[in-house]
Amino acid sequence: MGLSTLEQKLTEMITAPVEALGFELVGIEFIRGRTSTLRIYIDSEDGINVDDCADVSHQVSAVLDVEDPITVAYNLEVSSPGLDRPLFTAEHYARFVGEEVTLVLRMAVQNRRKWQGVIKAVDGEMITVTVEGKDEVFALSNIQKANLVPHF
């Protein structure tokens, strides 16, 4: 998923503090709106609980208060990726080859921006997804949002 310049800067700023607490920074989303939201996804081999989210929120808030990279009012949310885990990097897609995913593209491919299929392969910055029996290839930079589809 192509990150905005702000999201790239924020990722660089908060990766070290998150990792220092023993967590993986899965990714971030900055959603602009009347009340903007900075959403941070963390994970660990042991899973994530509410106290973990609070610890990361406290640490990240301190970094953001000093650096002050966001010029508008916003809410900070820290959570686990959940069952419908968002995918941000080529490594995330590679980790979940064989899993079903929904994609929202920045620019339409074949007149479609929304796609759902099974991740087949990752080649550099290109993601192959099998959609209705046909392989479709998407540039990571054209993927606005991607989430795993949970099955119960």
From Swiss-Prot:
GO cellular component terms listed in the entry, alphabetical order: cytosol
Query: Briefly, what is this protein's role?
Result: Required for maturation of 30S ribosomal subunits.
Quick one: where is this thing mainly located? cytoplasm
Q: Where are the transmembrane segments?
A: none
Q: What is this protein called?
A: Ribosome maturation factor RimP
Supply the Pfam families for this chain.
DUF150_C (PF17384), RimP_N (PF02576)
Q: Identify the keywords attached in UniProt to this record, alphabetized.
A: Cytoplasm, Ribosome biogenesis
* Coiled-coil portions: none
Q: Which domain of life is it from?
A: Bacteria
**Location relative to the cell:** Cytoplasm
Regarding protein family, the annotation reads: Belongs to the RimP family.
Disulfide bond residue pairs: none
Q: Name one GO biological process term.
A: ribosomal small subunit assembly
